[in-house]
Amino acid sequence: MKNAFLKTHLFPLCPLDESGSQWLKDIEEQARKENLESLVSYFSAKGKQVDFISAVMTLSPFLREVLIANPSYLSPLLYVDIETRLSEIIDDVALIDKSESINETALMAALRRKKREAHILIALADLSGVFTYEISCTWLTRLGEAALGVALRFLLREAHDHGKISLSSRDNPEKDSGLIILGLGKLGAGELNYSSDIDLIVFIDEMSPHIGDLSESVDVFSKMVRRLIRIIQERTAEGYVFRLDFRLRPDPGSTPLALPVRTALRYYEGRGQNWERAAMIKARPVAGDKRAGFKFLKELFPYVWRKYLDYAAIADIHSIKRQIHACKNYGQITAYGHNIKLGRGGIREIEFFVQTQQLIAGGRFPQLRGRQTVAMLTELHTLGWISEKTSDNLIKSYAFLRNVEHRIQMLADEQTHLLPNDVSQFTSVAYLMGYQESSSFIRDLLKVLQVVEKHYAALFENEQELGLEIGNLVFTGEEDDPETLITLSCLGFERASDICRIMRTLHCGRYKATQSAEARERLTELTPALLKAFGAIKRADEAMLRFDSFLQGLPSGIQLFSLLQSNPSLLDMLVLIMGAAPRLAEIITRKPHVFDGMLDPTILSELPTKTYLENRLEYFLEGVIPYEEILDHLRVFADEQRFLIGIRILNGAITGEKAGFAFTALADLMIAKTLAAVQEEFSRIHGNIKGGRVGILGMGKLGSCELTAGSDVDLILVYEHDEDAEISDGEKPLYISQYYTRFTKRLIAALSTLTSQGVLYAVDLRLRPLGNKGPVAVSFEFFRKYYRKEAWIWEYLALTRARGIAGDPNFLQNLENEVCAIIALPHDKKDVAKAVREMRTLIEKEKPPENRWDLKMMSGGIMDVEFIAQFALITHVVAFQIGASTADILAHLPNSVLNQSCIVDLHRAYSLYTNLNQMIRLCLNDAFDPHDMPPGLSDLLLSSVGEPDLLRVEKLIEETAQSVCSIFKQIMKH
């Protein structure tokens, strides 16, 4: 059980002067007048707690005045802890309207008395160290909500009694009333400060059954809100409850105080600004029809939380910050007179630091949709957006500044954030903070403000200078500016006139991307850095032309130009893509949204696991129900994730082998999700087969976890069912064979059909039993019999890469067990070796290598390394394991088959081929031609294998192929 507040240890405060003893006499005298004998005795004892009260009264004129006038506020604290008493006060507030005789005047008086008592107790608990600032804010928020609630209930009942509105329940007037009161800012976040304004917006749910004529309801409820303002805000002899602010509502200069929901939604969707999105992050129903309030916020969700990263918001947020900079109290960091909310290094900078990143990424990361600043700083660190040090620094700084804010406001109960210029008042703030002298407080204060400024500047103010002085860049008029042509030539462009033409086209707004004045303004700011970056690469003109094609396809350029301004490193990446990777350039030209993922701070530090991808996809598909929309969303998600894996390859963050695992994990998830969507849609029409279960085997590079950027997926669909099953049980029943054939075709279409969002994966079913001559769906029984009695050796080789990737988990396990049993069947090494040699000869005849860079088909290339691995598995030289990659198998080759030197050579060959092949497949759509490739690609290839020039790479490939060819012949000589 907690001790009574006045009998527990209270944080000692240094008094401002010796006047405390006189103030104690005054409060003791008033207590005696009110017959508060226990309190009189308590003060007479002069314990340490009394010294605390004495110090508080010397430091805060407001607290002194209220305590001397109302010593009864302290009496309960002789017997109970402060939270118990505050709970009683909140309960009392909630019951004020229960009296049938209550009128507006009595309500206002009662609210002010209760608020004043709670206000004093919260201050004492805060100053004494019994409350942290978070607990103080929570109680202030509860008090604010309770006051709003009781006042609104009173007004709703009165309107109902006068026939102005109709309530579903007089006892619970807020329920289904259709009147929504949202708390924003500190109230919405549950973080009210000591003398805080309360930000509110009032909406009318026109769909409520109790809302009749809408224009009449707007009038009635707007008048009700005006009375609510009077009840809560008006200063009387007993003070006020809270100051209310309704200026955050849509277009406050021309809209009523109570606004219909549909009108509000139209406003936000059509005219809403980014600062309003930022405000809505903290929005929460605090009074009225809360069910309707939550419904409204759900409808507003897409406006606040955009699915794609929103970097255009940064400029707007920054412009708000610049307006704050213009305030007379912003200036430099100081102590006396500094605005600890709006000033440099203040509370608002921490809030903007958080809210900006919430606006940018909250649509993609639900963890960032919280209302509270500290919790979101923690999440930003957890997600990798900020470092642990940054998170800890800002959390500690926020706590310090909120405590300072409270103490400034406790001096006179004023909504101010200015540290006093007056030395005595400034000292009072320092002492209320627990310091013994002002100098220590100033030292810590300045340190905190500097820490906040540093972290805020890293996000907003220390961006790379994009307006570089590089010479004339004039793109107006019809003629080329001669000095601009010289500048472009100096930058590295060979066709300066063509570049001028491109830039003129952009700046005159002929593309959708630059039709808005804002987009052209952002482009103008970006142009010097843009041209310098492109000019620095080989064949700069060619890359710039690709960039021009990219911009032609953009529906809007504001987002991109803002993104590049806010993240200059992305400009370098974009230039690299345009100069070295035509395939990626084509992708972002068709689907520019994939570039958003580049803003994920973990992009180069973490490889996406299947679990990570599952979580991301779950959030991405949130609220998506129609079958076609699911398929489109899967394509969008896969495009972006493939692009991000590709960026990791380009940056050298992952090897080719790791990229194979990442591409495979993504494909596994996409196929599994597509299968689930197809099953649901197909069974809706055709029902289910009794005991029917489906399993999909991934074959080829999908099965061995070695996919590349442009890989097809090789699949086999296997099914089983109860013995007595004959036909499905749906509205349009199908016999078993027909059912699974159509089901498989539906699955193939879901994966490979070209929709508005492209193709998910090209599908190849030719590795199934009997290939193109066999059924597209194979029963488990047929699968077993075929591989045990009819399969060719090449089919056993292919089966070594089989892996269950989607379907019924238990059935998949049975399927994989059967694959293991089939691979365990005895095979004569000579027969296998002969078959492999014949197969290799046939392939070489029918599909000869195109050039020395045909890493797959050339003699001693990828195919030969894979044949060696597969041969080792079906001849049981290496134990078979589901999902083993080629590298895994090579690692287990025994020295009895190959000496260690040969095994090392195979490993090196596999690594070399994989790194080169992943890079080539990533960057190019067509076959690689060393005589006609993007200049940037050669640099990427060199860095991927650590060689200085292409001749050395070609020599390395040649030597490696000869080594592999020799090993292949050695193994296959049986």
Curated annotation (Swiss-Prot):
Gene Ontology terms describing biological process: regulation of glutamine family amino acid metabolic process
Reactions catalysed: [glutamine synthetase]-O(4)-(5'-adenylyl)-L-tyrosine + phosphate = [glutamine synthetase]-L-tyrosine + ADP; [glutamine synthetase]-L-tyrosine + ATP = [glutamine synthetase]-O(4)-(5'-adenylyl)-L-tyrosine + diphosphate
Name the record gives this protein: Bifunctional glutamine synthetase adenylyltransferase/adenylyl-removing enzyme
Gene Ontology MF terms in the entry: [glutamate-ammonia-ligase] adenylyltransferase activity; [glutamine synthetase]-adenylyl-L-tyrosine phosphorylase activity; ATP binding; magnesium ion binding
Stretches the record annotates as Adenylyl removase: 1-464
Function, as annotated: Involved in the regulation of glutamine synthetase GlnA, a key enzyme in the process to assimilate ammonia. When cellular nitrogen levels are high, the C-terminal adenylyl transferase (AT) inactivates GlnA by covalent transfer of an adenylyl group from ATP to specific tyrosine residue of GlnA, thus reducing its activity. Conversely, when nitrogen levels are low, the N-terminal adenylyl removase (AR) activates GlnA by removing the adenylyl group by phosphorolysis, increasing its activity.
UniProt gene name: glnE
Family: Belongs to the GlnE family.
Cofactor(s) this protein requires: Mg(2+)
InterPro entries reported for this sequence: GlnE, GlnE_rpt_dom, NT_sf, PII_UdlTrfase/GS_AdlTrfase
Region (Adenylyl transferase): 468-974
Pfam name, any one: GlnD_UR_UTase
Organism encoding this protein: Bartonella quintana (strain Toulouse) (Rochalimaea quintana)
